[in-house]
């Protein structure tokens, strides 16, 4: 009942819902997006896929399947907490690629997850994965992911 009330209120007030859920919560988000197709939804932290150190294809499949809902967006953030948690986060690149292929840069956004993230890595560490180390992103893609998508979705710009 809580999700129903939240999605109904978001629909009435034209607000985006930011969902901090693990991968096992994505099916319920899918159901709610089917019931409320006009609600803008942002999945935080790549659906927390890999929070236990393992990136499961089934979890990535579920996250990518939500792209069928045109108002669903994904936030790439908390890289320090996902996957193998190694500097550079290169193990997350295949996950990011699949999500990029499903959603495109207009429905992806980056976030720092500060202040918690600053306890384990610098701000530079956080932005460098998207900004510098993912070769399949164009400069325009990076601008959208790092700035434009969030400006449009969160700040209605």
Provide a role label for each language-model segment.
Residues 1-109:
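Catalytic pocket-lining loop regions of alpha/beta-barrel enzymes
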Residues 81, 116-118:
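Short, active-site-adjacent cap segments at secondary-structure transitions
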Residues 113:
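Active-site glycine-centered loops adjacent to acidic/histidine catalytic or metal-binding residues
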Residues 98, 102-109, 118-157:
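Mid-to-C-terminal alpha-helical segments outside catalytic/metal-binding sites
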């Amino acid at each position: 009942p809580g999700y129903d009330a939240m999605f109904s209120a978001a629909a009435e007030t034209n607000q985006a819902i930011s969902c901090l859920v693990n991968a096992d919560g994505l099916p319920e988000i899918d159901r709610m997006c089917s019931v409320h197709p006009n609600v803008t939804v942002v999945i935080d932290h790549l659906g927390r896929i890999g929070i236990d150190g393992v990136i499961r294809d089934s979890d990535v499949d579920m996250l990518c399947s939500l792209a069928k809902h045109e108002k669903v967006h994904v936030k790439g953030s908390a890289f320090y907490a996902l996957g193998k948690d190694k500097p550079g986060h290169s193990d997350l690149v295949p996950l990011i690629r699949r999500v990029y292929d499903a959603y495109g840069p207009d429905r992806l956004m980056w976030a720092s997850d500060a202040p918690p993230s600053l306890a384990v890595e610098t701000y530079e560490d956080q932005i460098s994965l998207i900004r510098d180390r993912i070769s399949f992103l164009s400069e325009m893609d990076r601008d959208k992911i790092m700035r434009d998508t969030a400006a449009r979705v969160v700040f209605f710009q």
